[in-house]
Curated annotation (Swiss-Prot):
Post-translational modification summary for this protein: Contains 4 disulfide bonds.
Signal peptide, first to last residue: 1-21
Keywords assigned: Cleavage on pair of basic residues, Disulfide bond, Nematocyst, Neurotoxin, Secreted, Signal, Toxin
Propeptide residue interval(s): 22-36
Main location: secreted
GO cellular component, one term: nematocyst
Compartments, record wording: Secreted; Nematocyst
Family from the record: Belongs to the Cnidaria small cysteine-rich protein (SCRiP) family. beta subfamily.
Species classification: Eukaryota, Metazoa, Cnidaria, Anthozoa, Hexacorallia
Molecular function GO terms recorded: toxin activity
Name of this chain's protein: Small cysteine-rich protein 1
Function summary: Induces neurotoxic symptoms on zebrafish. Has also been claimed to be implied in calcification, but tests on homolog proteins suggest that proteins of this family have a neurotoxic function and not a calcification function.
Length: 79
């Protein structure tokens, strides 16, 4: 029973490391300009980019998939 528990714990840890590695690799492949925040959605319900939906510390909300790395149609917040 303990061996099964240890094996499942090991598999969970390895899975988490694999996911983290994939995310890190994706960030390295798609470098962003300094000051851009990746994929923080600040889109309102009517589809307009609104600064009020951004977290504290940001000064701008806009839609630019090249600059902010957001999916098409999504707004993102900048530092």
């Amino acid at each position: 029973m303990e061996a099964k528990f240890r094996l499942s714990l090991l598999l969970i840890i390895l899975g988490a490391l694999a996911v983290h590695g994939a995310r890190l690799e994706n960030k390295l492949e798609n470098p962003l300009p300094v000051g851009a925040k990746r994929s923080v959605n600040c889109q309102s319900m009517n589809g307009i980019c609104m600064y009020g939906n951004c977290p504290a510390g940001t000064t701008f909300c806009g839609y630019d998939p090249y600059t902010c790395g957001s999916p098409p149609g999504m707004c993102c917040c900048y530092d």
